[in-house]
Regions:
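Transition-metal
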Residues: 2-183
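Short, flexible helix-coil linker/hinge segments at the edges of structured domains or between repeats
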Residues: 178-197
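Loop-centered beta-sheet repeat module
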Residues: 194-206
Length: 206
């Protein structure tokens, strides 16, 4: 069976190709899965990927535990492939990144209001699945992220029962800190982040 990787990549002047596809399909673009590995987590094996391909990027990169949809964002993984995280549009025997399609076609794909405000497609969805819990971490608001020259990262989660027939090893999520936690306590944990047990879980709802 031919692989998406075997398709010819179109890297520029994609507007006519994309608009013809949108016209032929009634406004739909077919996107190939974007598989993302994480070196610090164990895959949960429930994202519709054959188990033999779980470590397709190599053991040093970690197992694939995420499948991104409609993504124009590259991963922040160390040692990543140049197009890691990017969704590819599949048109006949050709492929091009959704990011390139949006850059060339703008509001035709994302709509006038989003194109005017962001000049890009600023969000994506994903299957996210691990065997055990993920590390304690935070997501900055837009105002917080702006202080360090970044964008905010709001997220929402949905756990469809048809994709979660088993709970794996630790099917729980803890959010926030224990009442009474001070900013100085959190800062001290961050200072000790690479010193073994930094104590952050002592402050969390875990």
């Amino acid at each position: 069976i031919p692989s998406v990787l075997d398709l010819k990549i179109v890297k520029k002047s994609t507007q006519s190709l994309v608009e013809a596809e949108l016209s032929a399909t009634g406004g739909r673009l077919r996107l190939a899965p974007a598989w993302v590995p994480r070196s610090f987590l164990q895959p949960g094996l429930r994202i519709k990927l054959h188990p033999d391909d779980t470590y397709a990027y190599g053991l040093n990169r970690g197992g694939i535990d995420e499948r991104w949809f409609a993504s124009t964002t590259v991963t922040a993984n160390e040692g990543r492939a140049a197009d890691e995280g990017l969704s590819y549009c599949v048109i006949g025997k050709k492929r091009l990144t959704l990011a390139q399609a949006v850059e060339d076609c703008g509001a035709t794909i994302v709509g006038k209001s989003i194109w005017k405000k962001y000049g890009k497609w600023p969000v994506y969805s994903k299957f996210f699945d691990n065997m055990g819990p993920i590390p304690h971490h935070m997501h900055q608001s837009a105002a917080q992220a702006k202080l360090v020259g970044q964008e905010g990262k709001p997220e929402s989660y949905y756990f469809p029962p048809q994709h979660n027939p088993v709970g794996n090893n630790f099917p729980y999520t803890f959010m926030g800190f224990e009442p009474g936690t001070t900013k100085e306590q959190v800062k001290q944990c961050i200072r000790n982040w690479n010193k073994g047990d930094n104590g952050i879980l002592d402050l969390s709802k875990a």
